[in-house]
Amino acid sequence: MKRTTSSLLLGSSLLATLPAFAGDWLQWHGESLTYLYGKDFKVNPDIQQTITFEHANKWKYGDTFLFIDKIFYNGKTDASKGVNTYYGEFSPRLSFGKILDRKLAFGPVKDVLLAMTYERGEGLNAAYLIGPGFDLDIPGFNYFYLNIYLRNTEGSRPGDNVWQFTPGWSYTIPLGRSDLLIDGYMDWVTDNDQTRRGTYHANLHFNPQVKYDLGKALNLGAKQLYVGFEYSYWKDKYGIDSRGNLQSNQSVASALVKVHF
C-alpha cells in the first residue's frame, strides 16, 4: 500500500508541477514570507520563532500549495532536532472537472479533485497522503475546501492507513480603511495506529491566522503586508496521547508578520 500510494503521489505531483514548465497553463501564482513568534509550545521547546515560505498556484488542471518552515527554538535544544529544525508540505490537487471538461457541481460542491500531500520533517519524518478533495461554495468565503486523506508514513513508524480530514478556508471582513483576513486549516486524524515502534494516536490541529492588511491601510498596496496572529490548537500533538506522561495538548497564539511578493 505504501509503495502504491508513494508512486501515485509522485506521478500525480509531477503532473501537477507541469505549470513550471508550461507557462501558458499557469493561471496565477503567489509567494509569501511569514515571521512567527510564540510561547508555550508543547513537546518541543516552549518558545519558537518560525520563518515560513509559501507558494500557491492554480493551473489548467488543478492547484498546488507548498510551504516550508524553518523553526528556531530560541537558544534551547530539542532532544531529537537540536536548536532548530525544518518542516514542509507539498500539496498538489488535480481537478476532475477540469480534466474531464465538465461541471461536477452538486449541492455546495463546486468541483471534485484528487488531493495529495507529501509531509517532510527532519530525520525519518515523512508521510504520504492521498484522497478525494472538494471545493465548496460557501457564501461569504473567498474559498473553502475539504480534503479527505488516507495517511501512510515512510518507514516503520506508526501512523499508517489512518484517515485525515482537512478543511481550509479564507474569509475577508472590511475594517475601516482596510480589511481583516481570517484564513487557515484544520487537520483531524480520526484513527489510531500501533506498530512495534509505538502508537500513533488520533489528533486534531486547528490552525487559523487572523491578519490585518496593513499595506492597504498605509496605501502601500492591498494584500501585500499583513500583521496579526496565528493560533495553534493541537490536541494530542504529533499523535502523542496526552493521557500519558507527556503533555501534548497545545494552545499557542503567535505574533505574525507576513509579506506577499
Task: Cite the ranges covered by each PLM segment.
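N-terminal signal peptide c-region/cleavage motif recognized by signal peptidases
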Residues: T17-P19
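Short loop/turn motifs that connect adjacent beta-strands in outer-membrane beta-barrel proteins
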Residues: A22-H29, Y61-D63, F96-L113, D137-Y145, ...
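Short glycine/proline- and aromatic-enriched beta-strand/turn motifs that initiate or cap beta-hairpins
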Residues: A22-I71
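Transmembrane beta-strands of outer-membrane beta-barrel pores
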Residues: Y35-F41, K70-N74, M116-E122, I148-E154, ...
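Outer-membrane beta-barrel "beta-signal"
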Residues: N249-F261
